[in-house]
Curated annotation (Swiss-Prot):
Monomer. This is Ribonuclease R. Residues 775-791, 802-813 have a biased composition (Basic residues). Pfam families: CSD2, HTH_12, OB_RNB, RNB, S1. It catalyses: Exonucleolytic cleavage in the 3'- to 5'-direction to yield nucleoside 5'-phosphates. The modification N6-acetyllysine is found at residue 544. Its EC number is 3.1.13.1. One of its GO terms (molecular function) is exoribonuclease II activity. Residues 733-813 are annotated as: Disordered. The lineage of its organism: Bacteria, Pseudomonadati, Pseudomonadota, Gammaproteobacteria, Enterobacterales. The gene is rnr. Keywords: Acetylation, Cytoplasm, Exonuclease, Hydrolase, Nuclease, RNA-binding, Virulence.
Amino acid sequence: MSQDPFQEREAEKYANPIPSREFILEHLTKREKPASRDELAVELHIEGEEQLEGLRRRLRAMERDGQLVFTRRQCYALPERLDLVKGTVIGHRDGYGFLRVEGRKDDLYLSSEQMKTCIHGDQVLAQPLGADRKGRREARIVRVLVPKTSQIVGRYFTEAGVGFVVPDDSRLSFDILIPPDQIMGARMGFVVVVELTQRPTRRTKAVGKIVEVLGDNMGTGMAVDIALRTHEIPYIWPQAVEQQVAGLKEEVPEEAKAGRVDLRDLPLVTIDGEDARDFDDAVYCEKKRGGGWRLWVAIADVSYYVRPPTPLDREARNRGTSVYFPSQVIPMLPEVLSNGLCSLNPQVDRLCMVCEMTVSSKGRLTGYKFYEAVMSSHARLTYTKVWHILQGDQDLREQYAPLVKHLEELHNLYKVLDKAREERGGISFESEEAKFIFNAERRIERIEQTQRNDAHKLIEECMILANISAARFVEKAKEPALFRIHDKPSTEAITSFRSVLAELGLELPGGNKPEPRDYAELLESVADRPDAEMLQTMLLRSMKQAIYDPENRGHFGLALQSYAHFTSPIRRYPDLTLHRAIKYLLAKEQGHQGNTTETGGYHYSMEEMLQLGQHCSMAERRADEATRDVADWLKCDFMLDQVGNVFKGVISSVTGFGFFVRLDDLFIDGLVHVSSLDNDYYRFDQVGQRLMGESSGQTYRLGDRVEVRVEAVNMDERKIDFSLISSERAPRNVGKTAREKAKKGDAGKKGGKRCQVGKKVNFEPDSAFRGEKKTKPKAAKKDARKAKKPSAKTQKIAAATKAKRAAKKKVAE
């Protein structure tokens, strides 16, 4: 006891003090293995029955609080030294929950009793247990490592004179008591923001104070406000950031242009959506005399203005990404940068990072180089305009006559790159998205279906090519950077997906380890089916989520060995860090020393990159969840006016309690509950993804066409209830796979389509996307020398531009 630094504190509390909790933990830390209570009593010099009883109670309390674990061998151990798992608690409206462990496919079940020791969003240390009666693997919470401290949004109510808030997030299945002096004038039914002052425990209720009253009129704006607070998305600019950007001017300073390649006369153009406000990429393409193309991709030079460790950079890092809600945007950067200095607006000088590439007539990336430049966009084009120009719209072709030839070359390049993607087996998703059209009250007036055309796709292929080049550049230099990682699907996910496909009469080829091309063939084979969109969604769900990581493992979906995000530094922090790394390497090639450069280059450590990868991946998921919440609310709000109306749709998911239907053209899902079906007992076949009536034999399967009536909409829970009017059996075995078609068409030949297209490789079958061959060291050295400076063509353009501007300046003087 004499060595216990908290001995005096314990003596004040107890007549016969025992060692403090801190001292016991320190003692066990120094010990090589767990200790029994008797061993601890001897080692801590505990004497007498009273002290032994005190030690027993203290150890039990420490076990209860998660500071110690009582093992099967009747010993006390530190949790971190045992086979415990760290994870995030996912609550459920019915009181129980799950533990999501990183790197583990299946979540662990948390009983309602366990959920009394934690809340949704907590990061905890837990002990995996056996399975419960329903076969669910359980876990026991050992310790809350990082408690959820964010504010909670909910509605304020009073009952019998007691005020309380019911959280809007149903995963928080507890009410929060509000003392009378902490209500901030909130009235019954008002939406409020609460800060917890006392977390719920097994014995006590949660207590909090209202810190903000949002009002009682639930609209689109409030739905966004709730999502921002629920998902802890930063949306207020700190004062230090406001002060920093206040000094920025509207025009690029002349000194910033010095030393850069002048591309202002190169007809670079931006191509974006009609409602886009920030333009971070511009493109130009021309045919090479010897065949193939030269492609310039110019990206806004955000790294020049946003540098670590300034307040602006700290906030951009904290946000991680811009968040695009249907009705508004929460930008990663202040508007003076995102829509101003960094945005490649037409006819104004802008700083940029350029990736200049050469592409062969077969779509091979034959060379690339990076450099800092100054540019002036020659036009702000939209996908719709470019598509109409390519389709022959005479008015638009006359309006943009100087650019038509360049746009046609871009389109020619796209067709070759698209073919190269197909040959290497990259998966192309032809997604149809819902676009909300709002009225003056910011409610959805109608939902329109948007489809991608070749203008969207050509920009996508140009960006992918620049991203590949950037990834290779930093990887070759062994510079720490964030790669965009898309891991292979797990064996369990593949098996589950195949089970569903089999029920629909379809097959995923590729054996135990299907390659990207196998998924691409499947999508091609179902493209004409009425349930193609649903099948594509299922395919996406069977795959792993893409993340950011400095350890490159390739991108499965794109069938690429190296891929990184380079093209959107205005709205994605990983792109900004990649720009800094590239600038650092360019300066290093010129003999620069130090971790920073004059124009914003920066050398990150691997440890910094690991932390950034985790943070940026989290920020991306956070943004997705928030925008999904708002979209779900908007859809429910829209469907309020549709109650009683009849729609057609397709069964998109089947569960034991019913099936979900996705309405045609609206992309809105609702539930047909099993209790609303014909009078029968329905059995859920998980493998076959169907509900089967025991008496009637009526079956409802994934992909079935149905007609439903909208019965009810629950705005609080974001739920829509349908009732079934009629059903129609989904097509089975419609459309052979591309492999089967090739096999049938090439009967009697030695090889089919698969043999012609690709060799068995890891991710990158096509040589178009491989690195330089090691058998040609001279060519490699030549390419390396070229990469250090812009091409002769670019230098010629820059020199002519410089001379022209110098002449103008002389005349002016």
